[in-house]
Regions:
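C-terminal regulatory/oligomerization modules of transcriptional regulators
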Residues: 1-18, 131-161
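N-terminal helix-turn-helix DNA-binding core of bacterial DNA-binding proteins
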Residues: 24-66
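Canonical helix-turn-helix DNA-binding module
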Residues: 55-92, 96
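N-terminal positioning helix adjacent to the helix-turn-helix/winged-helix DNA-binding module
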Residues: 37-40, 56, 97, 108, ...
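Arg/Lys-rich, alpha-helical DNA-contact motif
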Residues: 18, 105-140
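Residues within the alpha-helical elements of helix-turn-helix
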Residues: 63, 101, 118
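Basic, amphipathic "hinge/linker" alpha-helix immediately C-terminal to the N-terminal HTH DNA-binding motif
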Residues: 90-109
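Short glycine/proline-centered loop/turn elements that form peptide/ligand docking sites
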Residues: 34-38, 54, 70, 77, ...
Length: 161
């Protein structure tokens, strides 16, 4: 009896990678998860500053879908890490280090969105998916994405954030 590809059962893993290799892979993912929170905050703060001139904790909390207390706690951590500063009654601002991180994240985000759109993922879906993917891909993978877009003639779209 002939089976098409959909009917094939899940193929079980028959060989595991070396322990150290697997541990490094999982470690990289855990590290990216912890960094993703700061990256999202820094990216949003930069966007708010660029569009409205201020980044208030209330606005940050609403846009990230977290409580005001959670936003305040995370902003305090950003300040301790040297990524942000605050001024009484003026909101949150990024340090040079925070601004550089925001720019790196914006570049990563645009590249992931461009690749997904080139693969015919609807733009709205690509934007949402890029919010997760951008934190987990390596620089080598991002370079491969850029190379693919350039060599395929699809190019990179101008920033539309």
């Amino acid at each position: 009896m002939s089976r098409n590809r959909k009917d094939k059962p899940f193929r079980a893993v028959t060989e595991l990678p070396a322990e150290l290799t697997q541990a490094r892979r999982f470690g990289k993912t855990r590290s990216a998860q912890s960094g993703a929170l700061f990256e999202d905050y820094v990216e949003l703060i930069a966007d708010l500053l660029a569009t409205t001139g201020e980044a208030r904790p209330t606005d940050i909390a609403r846009r990230l879908g977290v409580s005001h207390a959670t936003a305040i706690k995370t902003i305090s951590r950003l300040k301790r890490e040297g990524l942000a500063t605050g001024r009484p009654y003026r909101g949150v601002f990024l340090t040079a280090t925070g601004q550089a991180l925001a720019e790196r994240m914006r570049t990563r985000h645009r590249l992931v969105v461009d690749l997904l759109v080139a693969l015919r993922v609807p733009t709205e879906v690509a934007e949402a998916d890029a919010e997760g993917i951008e934190h987990y891909v390596s620089e080598a993978t991002l370079k491969a994405f850029a190379h693919f877009l350039q060599s395929s003639g699809l190019g990179v779209r101008p920033e539309k954030r």
